[in-house]
């Protein structure tokens, strides 16, 4: 992660060299004031998001710790549902076979 080099205080205390044809000092100051305000908002937002991230990570950890009790109960399907699925697959295959005979049987006759 990149490190933040500037703080609102550093921006405020930054001194610029002056030259004969330099920038307008008030314009630079106004711009830096805007930068300071934005930077302050960004710092608060990052802090808020880090706190939210920590809370969510704690939630995930606690949820995954309690998960094994539920996982063992739901991981094994009952044999009754397995029999129903195989019976319905058999019925579907019979139906498809009958439909294919009907469709392709007519094409061969024509």
Swiss-Prot record:
Listed GO CC annotations: cytoplasm
Pfam families referenced in this protein's UniProt entry, alphabetically: DivIVA
Alphabetized UniProt keyword annotations: Cell cycle, Cell division, Cell shape, Coiled coil, Cytoplasm
InterPro entries to which the protein is assigned, alphabetical: Cell_cycle_GpsB, DivIVA_domain, DivIVA_fam
Leader sequence segment: none
Keyword Cell cycle: yes
Compartments where located: Cytoplasm
Lyase keyword on record: no
UniProt record, GO biological process: cell division; regulation of cell shape
Ranges in a coiled coil: 37-67
Assembly and oligomerization: Forms polymers through the coiled coil domains. Interacts with PBP1, MreC and EzrA.
Similarity-based family: Belongs to the GpsB family.
PANTHER family reported in the protein's UniProt record: CELL CYCLE PROTEIN GPSB, CELL DIVISION PROTEIN DIVIVA
Cited function: Divisome component that associates with the complex late in its assembly, after the Z-ring is formed, and is dependent on DivIC and PBP2B for its recruitment to the divisome. Together with EzrA, is a key component of the system that regulates PBP1 localization during cell cycle progression. Its main role could be the removal of PBP1 from the cell pole after pole maturation is completed. Also contributes to the recruitment of PBP1 to the division complex. Not essential for septum formation.
Protein name: Cell cycle protein GpsB
Organism: Streptococcus thermophilus (strain ATCC BAA-491 / LMD-9)
């Amino acid at each position: 992660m990149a490190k933040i080099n500037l703080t609102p205080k550093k921006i405020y205390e930054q001194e610029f060299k002056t030259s004969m044809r330099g920038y307008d000092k008030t314009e630079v100051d106004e711009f830096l004031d805007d930068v300071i305000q934005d930077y302050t908002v960004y710092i608060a937002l990052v802090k808020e998001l880090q706190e939210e991230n920590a809370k969510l990570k704690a939630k995930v950890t606690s949820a995954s710790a309690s998960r094994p009790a539920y996982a063992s109960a739901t991981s094994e399907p009952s044999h009754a549902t397995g029999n129903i699925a195989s019976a319905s697959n058999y019925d579907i295959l019979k139906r498809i076979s009958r439909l294919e005979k009907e469709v392709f049987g007519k094409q061969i006759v024509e």
